[in-house]
Structures are given as C-alpha cells and as structure tokens.
Curated annotation (Swiss-Prot):
Residues 1-21 form the signal peptide. Belongs to the YebF family. The keyword Signal applies. It comes from the Bacteria. Keywords: Disulfide bond, Secreted, Signal. It comes from Salmonella paratyphi B (strain ATCC BAA-1250 / SPB7). It is found in: Secreted. Disulfide bonds join 34-107. GO terms for cellular component: extracellular region. Coiled coil: none annotated. Residues 30-117 form the YebF/Cmi domain. The keyword Transmembrane helix does not apply. This is Protein YebF. It holds the Pfam family YebF.
Length: 117
C-alpha cells in the first residue's frame, strides 16, 4: 500500500511540474505589419492578434481561462518601445482565470514573442 501511495504521489508531482513548465514557456509567432505605429496602434494590434489568431490556436490558454472568447486588454500607458520594437503587457481575462503576457514585438522582423508574466 505504501509503495502505491508513493508511486501515485510521484506521478502527480511530475505531472504538475511538467504542466508548470509548459505554462511558463514563451511562444514566438509571426506578427502582422506594424512599422510606423505608435503605442496605441501597437496595443490594438497585439490585442487583435491575440483575439483573432492566438486564442483559437492555443488550447492551453482556452482551458486555463475557461472559454474560447476571453476579454483581452492592454493599458496603452504601459506600452514602451522605439525603432519598431515594442514591449506590450497583455492581460487576458476569462471565466476561470487571468493570463498575463509580456509581448515583445519586432515590427521589422514581423515577429512577436508572448512571454507569461
């Protein structure tokens, strides 16, 4: 009986560690043309990209927030950047939880990296 309990505890621990590691990985994606945009334009682009392209493809985000169409927002005053490279804090709110990303956008390269905060 003790061996079963120890084995079950080990399995649960390893599953939770791997789930935590998966949730802290950053996700690199292609990003639409954004050269020349200001902070408000970048904020709108990041929000639109997440709602139209990311949530529909990232099942782990849907599961975490508890819905397929969560609310996403960016506080424009927190957006910083120069030379078409931006850092955008994105908050995604669902029925079950919130997800916070630090989105690093490189407009010239056409890429963005979503890093969990």
């Amino acid at each position: 009986m003790n061996k079963r309990g120890a084995l079950l505890s080990l399995l649960l621990l390893s599953a939770s560690v791997s789930a935590f590691a998966a949730s802290t990985e950053s996700k690199s994606v292609k990003f639409p043309q954004c050269e020349g945009l200001d902070a408000a334009g970048i904020a709108a682009s990041v929000k639109r990209d997440y709602q139209q392209n990311r949530i529909v493809r990232w099942a782990d985000d849907q599961k975490k927030v508890g819905q397929a169409d969560p609310v996403a927002w960016v506080n424009v005053q927190d957006v910083v950047g120069q030379n078409d490279k931006w850092t955008v804090p994105l908050t995604v709110r669902g029925k079950s939880a919130d997800i916070h990303y630090q989105v690093i956008v490189d407009c010239k390269a056409g890429k963005a990296e979503y890093k969990p905060r």
